[in-house]
From Swiss-Prot:
Keywords in alphabetical order: Ribonucleoprotein, Ribosomal protein, RNA-binding, rRNA-binding
Region: Disordered, residue numbers: 44-80
Molecular functions per Gene Ontology: rRNA binding; structural constituent of ribosome
Underlying gene: rplD
Job of this protein: One of the primary rRNA binding proteins, this protein initially binds near the 5'-end of the 23S rRNA. It is important during the early stages of 50S assembly. It makes multiple contacts with different domains of the 23S rRNA in the assembled 50S subunit and ribosome.
A Pfam family it matches: Ribosomal_L4
GO cellular component, one term: ribonucleoprotein complex
Organism: Oleidesulfovibrio alaskensis (strain ATCC BAA-1058 / DSM 17464 / G20) (Desulfovibrio alaskensis)
InterPro entries: Ribosomal_uL4, Ribosomal_uL4-like, Ribosomal_uL4_dom_sf
Oligomeric form and interacting partners: Part of the 50S ribosomal subunit.
PANTHER family: 50S RIBOSOMAL PROTEIN L4 (PTHR10746), LARGE RIBOSOMAL SUBUNIT PROTEIN UL4M (PTHR10746:SF6)
GO process terms (BP): translation
Keyword Nucleotide-binding tagged: no
Protein name: Large ribosomal subunit protein uL4
Length: 206
């Protein structure tokens, strides 16, 4: 059973917290993480790329010259793909890149991502972050005290003071337990769980 230290925003130890082993001590399988990350990234693709075919391109309605008698190769349109300025053959058309991943697999991948951060000792539990006012410098001070670089901070709810103070800091991303994703966990080198967010994360994945 994983027992982690709980720190305050000045990185002073305030206690300990036991994490659910079925969420934070799962064997990591890279192929599962890879599958889910690919699915999440594919789902974000717009897929709006489109080229004009010979049926949609402008012009090319009239036959360039008569079929027989000129000595030239027969041609029906100056927008044929073999002509300069002609249409494109088999070019990209709008499509949906998303593919289905079973709910059990998605949940398992999230557990694996959390487990990998704990195993690497890149998971920190912080009692809470209290800022006196909306100022980036206050959040920079907290991030410096906690030793945060590229970090994902999971907060129980989106506190405006915290969100507005952190949004201009490169590398710091805020999320709620409901928004947590495998891609975001793996994208950030550090994972910071506010103490109030630990139980909702565990409840979501049990």
């Amino acid at each position: 059973m994983a027992v982690v230290k709980v720190y305050d925003q000045d990185k002073k130890e305030t206690g300990e917290l036991t994490l659910a082993p079925e969420v934070f001590e799962v064997e990591v399988r890279p192929e599962i993480l890879n599958l889910v990350v690919r699915a999440q990234r594919a789902a974000k693709r717009a897929g709006t790329h489109s080229v004009k075919t010979r049926s949609t391109i402008s012009g090319g309605g009239a036959k360039p010259w008569r079929q027989k008698g000129t000595g030239r190769a027969r041609s029906g349109s100056n927008r044929s793909p073999v002509w300069r300025g002609g249409a494109v053959v088999f070019g990209p058309q709008p499509r949906d890149y998303s593919f289905k991943v079973n709910k059990k697999v998605r949940k398992l991948a999230l557990k694996m991502a959390l487990s990998s951060r704990l195993a690497e000792e890149n998971l920190m539990v912080v009692k809470g972050i209290e800022l006196p006012e909306v100022k980036t410098k206050h959040m920079v001070k907290v991030a410096g005290a906690l030793g945060l670089g590229k970090a994902l901070v999971v907060t129980p709810e989106m506190d405006d003071k915290l969100v507005l103070s952190a949004r201009n800091i490169p590398g710091i991303t805020l999320m709620t337990p409901e928004q947590l994703s495998v891609f975001e966990i793996l994208k950030h080198a550090q994972l910071v769980l506010l103490e109030g967010a630990v139980e909702p994360v565990q409840e979501r994945l049990k």
